[in-house]
Amino acid sequence: MLAKRIIPCLDVRDGQVVKGVQFRNHEIIGDIVPLAKRYAEEGADELVFYDITASSDGRVVDKSWVSRVAEVIDIPFCVAGGIKSLEDAAKILSFGADKISINSPALADPTLITRLADRFGVQCIVVGIDTWYDAETGKYHVNQYTGDESRTRVTQWETLDWVEEVQKRGAGEIVLNMMNQDGVRNGYDLEQLKKVHEVCHVPLIASGGAGTMEHFLEAFRDADVDGALAASVFHKQIINISELKAYLATQGVEIRIC
């Protein structure tokens, strides 16, 4: 059995790490490189960086900090933000990123997933999915351009259909960003994760809602996700990564202990 992964997420805007609640009202957390170094030293399995306004601004991720991160950490990291071409991806990977993640650009042009997978291999192509639960209809819908609340829009895709579509096109991993739970710290949406897991045949990463160590355990034990991504509990030092991993190990979760 592959070890489960603990993945801190760093949302980047204007060269700094920020964090919002349900993708809104972002506050500044701190500088990118020191935070990345701290999480690597605490035992994170990998890091994810989202340049959250790149797609809505019509630009690619700011590459200046990618190489600086690569110099100070020795764990894999993934970068996302406005990657719309093979050239964009090649530059980011050449600066030291191990994976690239696409979200809004994939919705705008689904063929991008296949072109990236064919060029760089499925192992480094992650598709992020921003999913919102509509209580009135009882359905999960995919959102686009979520980094800018004034431009966020609901797409025609229901979440489960999009999960299946991106796999057909070559996604090597899926990060499910559950917008209703984002930053609230009341736990992952286990029901949604279970539904997605049924149709997902590539590694599935849960994102949005972690508030306690038990929430991570539930995601691994009850929804059988491959990794759990979180931000605010790590940024605000509510949970220490090494302590989290020790706890998960005592609960029988296969996890890499530093």
From Swiss-Prot:
GO terms for molecular function: imidazoleglycerol-phosphate synthase activity; lyase activity. Heterodimer of HisH and HisF. Keywords: Amino-acid biosynthesis, Cytoplasm, Histidine biosynthesis, Lyase. CDD domains: HisF (cd04731). One of its GO terms (biological process) is L-histidine biosynthetic process. It comes from the Bacteria. It catalyses: 5-[(5-phospho-1-deoxy-D-ribulos-1-ylimino)methylamino]-1-(5-phospho-beta-D-ribosyl)imidazole-4-carboxamide + L-glutamine = D-erythro-1-(imidazol-4-yl)glycerol 3-phosphate + 5-amino-1-(5-phospho-beta-D-ribosyl)imidazole-4-carboxamide + L-glutamate + H(+). GO terms for cellular component: cytoplasm. It is an enzyme of class 4 (lyase). NCBIfam families: hisF. Belongs to the HisA/HisF family. It is found in: Cytoplasm. The active site is at 11, 130. The keyword Cytoplasm applies. It comes from Escherichia coli O9:H4 (strain HS). Pathway: Amino-acid biosynthesis; L-histidine biosynthesis; L-histidine from 5-phospho-alpha-D-ribose 1-diphosphate: step 5/9. Its EC number is 4.3.2.10. This is Imidazole glycerol phosphate synthase subunit HisF. IGPS catalyzes the conversion of PRFAR and glutamine to IGP, AICAR and glutamate. The HisF subunit catalyzes the cyclization activity that produces IGP and AICAR from PRFAR using the ammonia provided by the HisH subunit. The gene is hisF.
